[in-house]
Regions:
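Extended, charge-enriched "interface" segments that sit outside catalytic cores
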Residues: 39-239, 256
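Structural motif corresponding to the C-terminal cap of alpha-helices
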Residues: 216, 220, 251-255, 343-351, ...
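Subset of Sec-pathway N-terminal targeting signals
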Residues: 1-39
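Phosphate/diphosphate-binding loops
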Residues: 141-154, 165, 282-295, 410-414, ...
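Active-site pocket-lining segments that scaffold enzyme catalytic pockets across diverse folds
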Residues: 217, 221-281
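Cofactor-binding active-site loop characterized by glycine-rich and histidine/acidic residues
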Residues: 260-437
Length: 484
């Protein structure tokens, strides 16, 4: 244990242990007992208040009298009882503040407005300060420096407002299930710094609007020209195309030369056109019953247009290009997942001999899931389990759940036993980011954080893109029959 085995945010917990040590030294863990036994000077320098009666309890080591009376002890001896009472009140307020701040980090996603259809967030009891026996008025009196190290000269009220904006906006974060505390701390720092949520510049907003217009225009053209033909529209989750654009760009920044995509039928035609670069003519050939030249095809299979695979290249802002492979999709939902993992792993190898090295940054796997399928298909769990195995890991997969809040005709309440479609990933300690599909800039922020995390830890990350389905399951569907 370090000489100071806690940071400022855990000072209230350390103080409570110190109070217990003063009454019963054997009642605290051995490592803490060793720290407290260093003496009042060491504990005072660490920022703790020396409990009354510590010298009389006979616990711990004996301390030399000369030269070690801490400033806090001296102040306590000379202070009036009212001042001592005020100090203890302050200590309790700091404890309440740290608990309330932790509640934002752990449960803020339950107040986030991630549903574009406007459902009320469920909330959580700990997101009300009264749960901890305090109030906003009491907390607002505290300086932020009592709770946050390196805090600016501002009140805790300002910090709490910033935390609410960070954790309870149109992005919700779930990190509390992650086992590695250093990873959790890193994620907190990313969220609270706001680096990934910086507003877009005007030019970037114009390009985002242009991209969304292209996505919508293709869907509307196909809907008009081929009325009633199945295409499994992406409408309601249109933002996934700009999200993939950004994922490609962010991957290239850290050395990626290729991205391997896997997805089911929903939105596949738009991905073929705007991410892989398959021409509109090739897509319309499929609607006309003519085989597209640019797709992966096998003679005699009769595979449908929204199952075709393809490959292409996308130009990046810096003038370079990145190669994109969209794996062919079987009709069995999510079965493509381990195939994409294997393709990515193989492409990461630099050679074929025993000395060949694998570069996880060179090739990135991105999987797009359906909400019902992610929760319900066993192959999803099997693939997630490969994520950290030495023989199989592709160095981190970016998962995007197209969460349109319905599985064919089944509502979430009838299709899964968990609150979120992404909850399966909690068992693997992967970070989860929920985001409102109707907030384009928030969606890009989610991708930005996911790609930075993947580059930092070479680990899987989940984006739960909460949208909706504008039409029926497919465009030939009559909702009054299939969803009465």
């Amino acid at each position: 244990m370090d000489d100071k085995p806690f940071d400022r945010q855990n000072a209230a917990y350390a103080q409570a242990l110190y109070e217990e040590f003063a009454l019963n030294p054997e009642g605290v863990p051995e490592q803490w007992r060793d720290f407290f036994a260093l003496g009042p000077q060491a504990t005072a320098e660490a920022g703790l208040l020396v409990p009354e009666g510590l010298a009389e309890n006979g616990g711990g080591r004996s301390y030399p009298e000369a030269g070690i009376t801490s400033p806090v002890v001296a102040a306590e001896r000379s202070a009036a009882p009212q001042e001592a009472h005020t100090m203890r009140h302050l200590l309790r307020a700091v404890a309440h503040a740290t608990s309330f701040i932790q509640a934002y980090r752990d449960h803020g996603h339950q107040l986030s407005t991630v549903d574009p259809l406007g459902s009320e967030p469920p909330g959580h009891p700990q997101l009300d300060p009264s749960f901890f026996g305090t109030s906003l008025e009491e907390l607002q009196e505290l300086p932020a420096s009592l709770v946050f190290e390196n805090a600016r000269d501002e009140s805790l009220a300002v910090v709490l407002e910033r935390l609410q904006q960070a954790y309870c906006g149109t992005i919700g974060y779930e990190f509390e299930h992650i086992e590695d505390p250093s990873v959790v701390r890193w994620l907190w720092d990313q969220v609270e710094s706001g680096t990934h949520t910086r507003p877009l510049e005007t030019g970037d907003r114009v390009r985002l609007l242009q991209r969304l217009t292209e996505v919508e225009s293709l869907e509307q053209f196909l809907h008009t020209a081929y009325l009633g033909q199945k295409r499994f529209s992406i409408e309601g989750s249109d933002i996934v195309i700009p999200m993939l654009d950004l994922a490609l760009h962010e991957s290239a920044k850290v050395g990626a030369k290729r991205v391997v995509l896997g997805m089911a039928h929903r939105g596949r035609l738009n991905v073929l056109a705007h991410i892989v670069g398959l021409g509109y003519e090739e897509i319309t050939r499929e609607f006309e019953g003519i085989q597209a030249k640019g797709a992966f095809t096998v003679e005699g299979t009769g595979d449908v247009k929204y199952h075709q695979g393809a490959q292409g290249e996308q130009s990046l802002p810096d003038g370079s290009t990145i190669h994109i492979t969209l794996a062919p999709n079987p009709s069995h939902l999510e079965f493509v997942n381990p195939v994409v993992e294997g393709m990515t792993r193989a492409l990461q190898n630099t050679g074929y001999d025993q000395d060949a090295k694998r570069d996880p940054a060179a090739v990135v796997a991105i999987l797009i899931h359906g909400d019902a399928a992610f929760a319900g298909e066993g192959v999803v769990a099997e693939t997630l389990n490969l994520g950290r195995l030495d023989g199989y890991t592709p160095g981190g997969t970016v998962h995007i759940i197209l969460d349109n809040q319905i599985g064919f005709t089944t509502l979430p309440i009838h299709g899964r036993s968990t609150r979120y479609a992404s909850d399966l990933a909690k068992g693997f300690s992967f970070p989860i980011i929920h985001v409102n599909a109707d907030d384009p800039e928030a969606c890009l922020a989610a991708v930005r954080l996911a790609m930075v995390y993947r580059a930092e830890y070479h680990d899987d990350v989940i984006i739960d893109l909460v949208g909706y389905r504008r039409y029926g399951h497919n465009e030939g569907d009559e909702p009054s029959f299939t969803q009465p």
